[in-house]
């Protein structure tokens, strides 16, 4: 006979305690979540990344072609847009975690995304000669320019709610309280990135070719169609999803309010004695892993003397959550050393390829932006090797369930990123030397007799760096933030890339100004045969090396949140 206790245990195993299904009742493990739901969401991401990179991967060619911008101005514009597009997810994640929830935020963001892509397609139809590739046409009117950039930033706004929430929603399909599902969640981040890269590869191979060889308007319209497909696919999977339980009550249930209150109360207790603080800590029994440098937050465990009647002290769990967020800041700052070099493949890597020999067969040339597909190919090849071969080997050596800790994985990618910049600098030096040998310094439209395949190593190495650093950052920031703020966690990883792009844009503008612009010996002269991208790559290699050393020093003292370790 089954006892009441056994019945309760069976019920707990059958249902996910922290999630509900689409009807709002407790989610069953057997028919919700896990890989069945995750593959639906991964499919949504594949379609969305196809749409995004259908625009982003060849944007610099559109700016220097139909819009008639200089190389430096176009690179700065691409970096600025890319930076803002990856910073805005902080806002989208805030809206999701504090108000709408992830599912509703994704729906609203997708509609804005589709609208932006539709306007972008319309703007390309209205620009004369917009189907030409690298040939700079007469500058379009201010109105058309305004429509184009309005559409572009509308896409960025749409992505801000879509990007962090879709991945967090996918990871939510695995219950971290179940050992098997917790292990599956770690693999989810690997397969998520592999599938996403497949969508990017498809966009680069298909859309870029159409944009260069046929029509920019048609090339922008295809991503719009794929974004519509993404939205439809997401809605179709709704009955299989697990949704986080929404907490009810007063304003204290808002995670942002609770964490902000920790700082407010701590600062209202500035003169709390050490003995009194120790007493409060012992009574509250906060985590012993809490670093001593952040003990000032524990002052919020005591009600301030001048507090209003009825005001209560903060809970120890809220103090731990606030402490965890602060301790992420140094790690986040050091990842900028990876984000700045990462921004270059959308701009200068592509412009290098424009000047080189691109003939595959007689009469057939490869679009320079198409080489970006090599990043995705290296990811698609290496992720299964990493997940199925290297992780078990590393696990047997390190005794860590994930093989490499998340921070070690990020560090390996940062080293590979620095090496990528070294190789890029050497290849660019060779290209400039070849141009000089053949008397092409003053002939920017001439093809330098050096194959575009010389760029392959830097693209492949960047892909390997991505597998380590970007996937590591996704898992790290998702797992190390409080459970209720996991959309914010993934937005933090994106914001690092966004700030890196903005810093890259600023760095380019400052260096271009300092070295004289197109009229002088600018490192970013529109005539790349007179430019010095090699100097810029060497500078980024040094910055990457310094950033890695700083990251290594900081990561040595980092203590993982025990509840989230895999």
Predicted segments — roles?
Residues 2-131, 137-566:
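Hydrophobic transmembrane alpha-helices of multi-pass solute transporters/permeases
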